[in-house]
Amino acid sequence: MEQQYILENAKSFKPVHIFECGQCFRWNKQEDGSYTGIFKNNVINVKQENQNIIFSGNCSGNIKEICIEYFDLNANYEEIKGRLSKIDNYLKNSIEYGNGIRILKQDLWETLISFIISANNNIPRIKTIIERISKAYGDKIEFRRKDYYTFPTPEKLKKVGIDDFRNLGLGFRDIRVYETVGKTLRNEIDLNKLEKEESVETLREKLLEIPGVGPKVADCVMLFALKKYEAFPVDVWVRRVISELYFDNQEQKPKKIQEFAKKQYGNLAG
């Protein structure tokens, strides 16, 4: 049965900036301008009508509670933007340009595998691969006469081999995903401990031990799944922009940019 929740007079919520900024891969724009996505065991459509955000979906629980957690609706983004805007004009202008973006609270397992797949990849291809994995091994959920598929748990991927992943288009990432599944099933990667770890440095060290996880992927996982807002993922574009704006166009190494972000933005760097 379809549920609905309406967020009235919504501030700091612009679907296009949330779903098309590269933090998530299971959301797609619909013909009416809304977005439909699947996360965990929920399929939800998000539509903006004037100042209201309408959430409609086939959910595993109460849609309001699910949306509050996933979209971090209890966080005061107006206050956060106000604090960040005072740091410098570059950041102030960026906040105005990207107004309405929110950091989602995504599933750790799906986020981990998704960003391992993201290595040397582009967003359309990442989305295609994740959709193939989900359709092949996930559970089907129907919503508005269309079939959606959950991202498979480690247990669902237990018997999936390297060749199976390769046939889904993972390329060189197939062995990394295969090994990560195995390590998780053997509890060498403890997802529960990762979720409970409070120290960002300890968490980063543990994530870097996972096959296919480098510094950027580790920071993406911390920021987009574990609410570590001080995490600052550095890709080639972030590196270029920070180098140009703050270092007189002298290209800096990722570690230097990480240090700069920590000093400049503190625990809101992400």
Regions found by a protein language model. Name each.
Residues 1-270:
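HhH-family (HhH-GPD) DNA N-glycosylase catalytic core used in base-excision repair
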